[in-house]
C-alpha cells in the first residue's frame, strides 16, 4: 500500500504520509494514511473546528432549545442552517440561532455581563422555550469568561429554565471530532439522570448518533415503533432536551454514528450498565441485519422479520432498476466521517457502483481502517485533503460522481464532475429501505443529468451536438447499452415514492403490543 504524493503538495512533504493507494492483496497492516492529526500549516484544510463539531453537528439538532454561541457573530453564522436536520416542531432550531456578538471591547474588558444579558433576552423573545445550550468559542475561552457561572446565575433567577453549557472552543481538538467528544461527555456529566421519564413499553432504547438529516431519524423511529419499541430519546436529531436528560433509563443504546457519539454510549454503559448495539440504517442488507439484531436483543425477531419482508418486497424492484443503470460507474466517496465505511461496500454490492477513492476530514484511524478494508484494489485513500489535492485526485481518477459535502462538491462541479451532498443530502431521507432507493435515484439523476453532457461543449466554437428533434433525457443516456430484457423489464421500476416521505410518518398509528406482567 504505497503512499501517494500529490504533485500540488510536494512543497509540503509531510502530506505524503496522508494518502495511500491500496495494492493487490495488501492488508491494513501494510500502510494506512496518517489521520486525526493537526492540519499541516500551508495545507488549506476543509475541516471544521471543535466548536463546529459540538454545536453544528450534535447540539443544534435538539429541537426545543435556544442555541446561543458566546463569541463573534461569524462563529454562529458559520454553523447556522447549513445542515437540514429537520424536526417535528416546525424546525424551530433551524430557524433561530443566537450569538452574543462579542466585539473588541469585550475581549479587553470581558463579556460575561454581555452573555447574561443575551441569555435573558433570548428567553424573553421565545417565552415558550425553557431550555438553552450555550457554546464557548475561541475568543471567549481565551479571555477566561466563566460561562458555567453565568448559566448558574440565570437558573437561580429563572428557576423554570434549564441551561446546558458546552465548553468546546474551536482549538479544543484537531478537527470537529474533538467537539463531538466534548459535548458527549459534557451532556452526561451535566444532564443525564436529572429527569425521570415515563416508561410505556417493555423494550426501551436510546437512539444515539442520529441527527435527522431530512428525516432520517423519523424513518428509523418508524421501524422501531412498528416493532413495539419505545424510543426514550434520540441523541440528538429531532430529540428533546428533557428526553435526553432521561437517557439513563433505557434498556439499550442503539448507536448509528460511532464517530460522533460512541463516547456517550460508552459512558452510559460504564455508569448505568446500558449495553451498546451498533447499527447501520443505510442499505437493504445492513439495515435488515440491524433490525434483526435489535429484535434478537429483545426477543422480538418475528416483528423485525415482518417489517423487513414487507419493505424489501415493496422497494427492491426499484433499487434494482437503478442498479442496472449505475453498474460500473466510478464514485469518489468523500463524506468525511463514518459514512466512509457505512457506504463503501454497500453501494458497490447494492447499486453496482465502483468506489475509486475514500477520504476522511475528521475521522480517526479506525474509520479509515474500516473504509479501506471494504474497498477494492487501486482505491486512493486520503486523510484531510486540501482543495488542490481533491482536484488532482479527480483528474487522476476521472470519477462519474463524488459523494461529499458542499465545499468540495461545488469545486467538483466547476470541473464538470457531478456531486451528491453526502452531509445534508439533496432529496433525502436516505436511511431506510425507501430512503436507500431515493439515494440511488439521486445518484442516477446526477450522473445522467443532460446538463453534464452539455457542460463540456465550447459554444463559442459552434459545435453543439445534433440531437435530432429533441433534448436527450436521462433515460435516453442511461439505457443505450442495456439489454432488451432489462430495458423492457416489467418487474423493475423507477422510484414511485412521493416527494415528502416523512410527513406521513408523523400521522401514523402503531400497533399496541401487550406488555409483560411483572
From Swiss-Prot:
Database matches in InterPro entries: Nase/OxRdtase_comp1 (IPR000510), Nase_asu (IPR005974), Nase_comp1_asu (IPR010143), Nase_comp1_CS (IPR000318), Nase_Fe-Fe_asu (IPR011290)
Principal EC category: oxidoreductase
Entry-linked PROSITE patterns: NITROGENASE_1_1, NITROGENASE_1_2
Key words of the record: ATP-binding, Iron, Iron-sulfur, Metal-binding, Nitrogen fixation, Nucleotide-binding, Oxidoreductase
Miscellaneous note of the record: The structure of the 8Fe-9S-C-homocitryl cluster is assumed to be analogous to the 7Fe-Mo-9S-C-homocitryl cluster.
Similarity comment: family membership: Belongs to the NifD/NifK/NifE/NifN family.
Function: This iron-iron protein is part of the nitrogenase complex that catalyzes the key enzymatic reactions in nitrogen fixation. Other nitrogenase complexes utilize a molybdenum-iron protein or a vanadium-iron protein.
NCBIfam families assigned to the protein according to its UniProt record, in alphabetical order: alt_nitrog_alph, ANFD, N2-ase-Ialpha
Protein name as it appears in the record: Nitrogenase iron-iron protein alpha chain
Origin species: Azotobacter vinelandii
Organismal lineage: Bacteria, Pseudomonadati, Pseudomonadota, Gammaproteobacteria, Pseudomonadales
Amino acid at each position: 500500500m504505497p503512499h501517494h504524493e500529490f504533485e500540488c503538495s510536494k512543497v509540503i512533504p509531510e502530506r505524503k504520509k496522508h494518502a495511500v493507494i491500496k495494492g493487490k492483496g495488501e492488508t491494513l497492516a501494510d500502510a494506512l494514511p496518517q489521520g486525526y492529526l493537526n492540519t499541516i500549516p500551508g495545507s488549506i484544510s476543509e475541516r471544521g473546528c471543535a466548536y463546529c463539531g459540538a454545536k453544528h453537528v450534535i447540539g443544534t439538532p435538539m429541537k426545543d432549545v435556544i442555541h446561543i454561541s458566546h463569541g463573534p457573530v461569524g462563529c454562529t453564522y458559520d454553523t447556522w442552517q447549513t445542515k437540514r436536520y429537520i424536526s417535528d416542531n416546525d424546525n424551530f432550531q433551524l430557524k433561530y440561532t443566537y450569538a452574543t456578538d462579542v466585539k473588541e471591547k469585550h475581549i479587553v474588558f470581558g463579556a460575561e455581563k454581555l452573555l447574561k444579558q443575551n441569555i435573558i433576552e433570548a428567553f424573553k423573545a421565545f417565552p415558550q422555550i425553557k431550555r438553552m445550550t450555550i457554546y464557548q468559542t475561541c475568543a471567549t475561552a481565551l479571555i477566561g469568561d466563566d460561562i458555567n457561572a453565568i448559566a448558574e446565575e440565570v437558573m437561580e433567577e429563572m428557576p423554570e429554565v434549564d441551561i446546558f453549557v458546552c465548553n468546546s472552543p474551536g482549538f479544543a481538538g484537531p478537527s470537529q471530532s474533538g467537539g463531538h467528544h466534548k459535548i458527549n461527555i459534557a451532556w452526561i456529566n451535566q444532564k443525564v439522570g436529572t429527569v425521570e421519564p415515563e416508561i410505556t413499553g417493555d423494550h426501551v432504547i436510546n437512539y444515539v448518533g442520529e441527527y435527522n438529516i431530512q428525516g432520517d431519524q423519523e424513518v428509523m423511529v418508524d421501524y422501531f415503533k412498528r416493532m413495539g419499541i419505545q424510543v426514550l430519546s434520540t441523541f440528538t436529531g429531532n430529540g428533546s432536551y428533557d428526553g435526553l436528560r432521561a437517557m439513563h433509563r433505557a434498556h439499550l443504546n442503539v448507536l448509528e454514528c460511532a464517530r460522533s457519539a460512541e463516547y456517550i454510549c460508552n459512558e452510559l454503559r460504564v455508569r448505568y450498565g446500558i449495553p451498546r448495539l451498533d447499527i447501520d440504517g443505510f442499505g437493504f442488507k445492513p439495515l435488515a441485519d440491524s433490525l434483526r439484531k435489535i429484535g434478537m436483543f429483545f426477543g422480538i425477531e418475528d416483528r423485525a422479520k415482518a417489517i423487513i419482508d414487507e419493505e424489501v418486497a415493496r422497494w427492491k424492484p426499484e433499487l434494482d432498476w437503478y442498479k442496472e443503470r449505475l453498474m460500473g460507474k466510478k464514485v469518489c466517496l468523500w463524506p468525511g466521517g463514518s459514512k466512509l465505511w457505512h457506504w463503501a461496500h454497500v453501494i458497490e454490492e447494492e447499486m453496482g457502483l465502483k468506489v475509486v477513492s475514500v477520504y476522511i476530514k475528521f475521522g480517526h484511524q479506525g474509520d479509515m481502517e474500516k473504509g479501506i478494508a471494504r474497498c477494492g484494489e487501486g482505491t486512493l485513500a486520503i486523510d484531510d485533503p486540501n482543495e488542490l489535492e481533491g482536484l488532482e485526485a479527480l483528474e487522476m481518477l476521472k470519477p462519474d460522481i463524488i459523494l461529499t459535502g458542499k465545499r468540495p462538491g461545488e469545486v467538483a462541479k466547476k470541473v464538470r464532475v457531478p456531486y451528491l451532498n453526502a452531509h445534508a443530502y439533496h432529496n433525502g431521507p436516505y436511511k431506510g429501505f425507501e430512503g436507500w432507493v431515493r439515494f440511488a435515484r439521486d445518484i442516477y439523476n446526477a450522473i445522467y443529468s443532460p446538463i453534464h453532457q452539455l457542460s463540456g461543449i465550447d459554444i463559442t466554437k459552434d459545435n453543439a451536438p445534433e440531437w435530432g428533434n429533441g433534448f436527450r433525457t436521462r433515460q435516453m443516456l442511461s439505457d443505450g447499452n442495456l439489454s432488451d430484457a432489462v430495458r423492457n423489464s416489467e418487474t423493475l421500476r423507477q422510484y414511485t415514492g412521493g416527494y415528502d416521505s416523512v410527513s406521513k410518518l408523523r400521522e401514523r398509528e402503531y400497533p399496541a403490543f401487550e406488555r409483560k406482567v411483572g
